[in-house]
């Protein structure tokens, strides 16, 4: 699991993708790489 996702951060989706190394996304308050 990557860093928490905050909707106030406009770059959060990109950070999640970078951390997951692909097209994964934020689910709720967390960045989940197994979906």
Curated annotation (Swiss-Prot):
Classification of source organism: Eukaryota, Metazoa, Ecdysozoa, Arthropoda, Chelicerata
Disulfide bonds: 2-19, 5-26, 16-31, 20-33
Protein name, as recorded: Insectotoxin-I5
Function description: Toxin with unknown function in healthy organisms. On glioma cells, interacts with chloride channels (probably ClC-3/CLCN3) and MMP2 at the surface of glioma cells. This complex is then internalized via caveolae, thus inhibiting the chloride channels necessary for cell shrinkage and tumor propagation.
Keyword Hydrolase among UniProt keywords: no
Source species, domain of life: Eukaryota
Gene Ontology CC entries for this record: extracellular region
Keywords: Chloride channel impairing toxin, Disulfide bond, Ion channel impairing toxin, Knottin, Secreted, Toxin, Voltage-gated chloride channel impairing toxin
Tissue: Expressed by the venom gland.
Domain notes: The presence of a 'disulfide through disulfide knot' structurally defines this protein as a knottin.
Cellular localisation: Secreted
Family: Belongs to the short scorpion toxin superfamily. Chloride channel inhibitor family.
Gene Ontology molecular function, alphabetical: chloride channel regulator activity; toxin activity
């Amino acid at each position: 699991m990557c860093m928490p996702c905050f909707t106030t951060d406009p770059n959060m989706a990109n950070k999640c993708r970078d951390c997951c190394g692909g097209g994964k996304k934020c689910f709720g308050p967390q960045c989940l790489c197994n979906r």
